């Protein structure tokens, strides 16, 4: 029963994040990255705050430092991902974003002295993932997109791993899933605010674009709740493996709605990255 609930949560998580990525992809040509991030995160924080009496989570936290650190790392990761969504095929950007499990073992090793050192299998998976990145870059010919954007996407995955690391720590500290969603959205919105059109006073995007990004923020809140629920539960293997279905969903959605065709070589690189990440999650869960 518990595993079925995890599967259901993971399905909601990947559907929400896929639709959110699609909306951001469409609006990235109309709005600057900082504006998208602020509207998305502020909308998420305000809606969760408005529903606080119903959701029943505490507005005071005993781990505010962890929330701030997770929010800052997540903001950088989201900024990079939003940028890559605008310049890369949607499925390629989503795949690069899901490299974060490959970095998680290295992040834990660098930040937690008690963490178990990555084994040979985990290091081999990391190497396999980078082989997939090289295939995407295609140094001898035309790659799957601008090489700088692909390299930046890898950096974004590393930053996302830093944010994911704090989910378990927050869960251990007794923080609820909706507390994590609220504080993550709040910190990210405040971090993006100084770079937005509200400060520059040069807003050019229309009301419709902002409304779409608000919807993306609500979908992001649902997705973040799924992340907090699945990755904080102690049994993240099923959820983390299932989230890679969103790569397939992104491929289909971007092809049908945007006409984005991905080459056979790019598909091969994406397959290597996904296989490496799934193997990493499976190995860690044994």
Q: What are these language model-derived features?
A:
Residues 4-13, 56-82, 147-156, 196, ...:
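Loop-to-transmembrane-helix transition segments
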Residues 5-6, 30-76, 103-107, 159-163, ...:
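Transmembrane alpha-helices of multi-pass small-molecule transport proteins
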Residues 7-11, 62-73, 117-130, 149-154, ...:
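Cytoplasmic-side transmembrane-helix entry/capping segments in multi-pass membrane proteins
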Residues 22, 48, 140-200:
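Transmembrane alpha-helical segments that form core, pore/gating elements
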Residues 29-46, 82-103, 146-159, 205-220, ...:
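Structural signature of hydrophobic alpha-helical transmembrane segments
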Residues 83, 100-124, 248-267:
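C-terminal transmembrane-helix exit sites in multi-pass transporters
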Residues 93-99, 170, 174-187, 224-255:
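Helix-helix packing/entry segments at the starts of transmembrane helices
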Residues 120-139, 265-284:
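Hydrophobic transmembrane alpha-helices of multi-pass small-molecule transport proteins
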């Amino acid at each position: 029963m518990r595993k079925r609930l995890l599967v259901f949560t993971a399905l909601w998580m990947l559907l929400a994040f896929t639709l959110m990525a699609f909306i951001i992809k469409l609006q990235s040509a109309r709005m600057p990255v900082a504006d998208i991030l602020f509207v998305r995160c502020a909308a998420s924080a305000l809606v969760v705050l408005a529903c606080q009496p119903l959701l029943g989570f505490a507005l005071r936290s005993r781990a505010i430092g962890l929330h701030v650190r997770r929010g800052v790392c997540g903001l950088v990761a989201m900024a990079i991902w939003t940028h890559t969504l605008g310049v890369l095929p949607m499925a390629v950007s989503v795949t690069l974003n899901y490299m974060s499990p490959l970095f998680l073992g290295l992040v834990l090793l660098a930040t937690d002295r008690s963490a178990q050192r990555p084994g040979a299998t985990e290091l081999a998976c990391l190497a396999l993932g980078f082989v997939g990145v090289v295939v995407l870059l295609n140094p001898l010919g035309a790659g799957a997109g601008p090489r700088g954007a692909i390299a930046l996407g890898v950096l974004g995955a590393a930053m996302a791993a830093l944010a994911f690391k704090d989910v378990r720590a927050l869960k251990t500290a007794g923080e609820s899933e909706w507390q994590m969603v609220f504080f993550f959205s709040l910190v990210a919105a405040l971090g993006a605010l100084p770079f937005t059109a509200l400060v520059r006073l040069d807003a050019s995007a229309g009301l419709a674009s902002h409304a779409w990004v608000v919807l993306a923020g609500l979908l992001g809140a649902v997705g973040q709740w799924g992340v907090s629920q699945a990755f904080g539960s102690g049994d993240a293997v099923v959820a983390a493996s299932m989230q890679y279905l969103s790569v397939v969903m992104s491929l289909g959605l971007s092809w049908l709605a945007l006409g984005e065709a991905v080459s056979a070589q790019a598909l091969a690189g994406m397959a290597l990255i996904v296989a490496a990440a799934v193997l990493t999650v499976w190995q860690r869960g044994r």
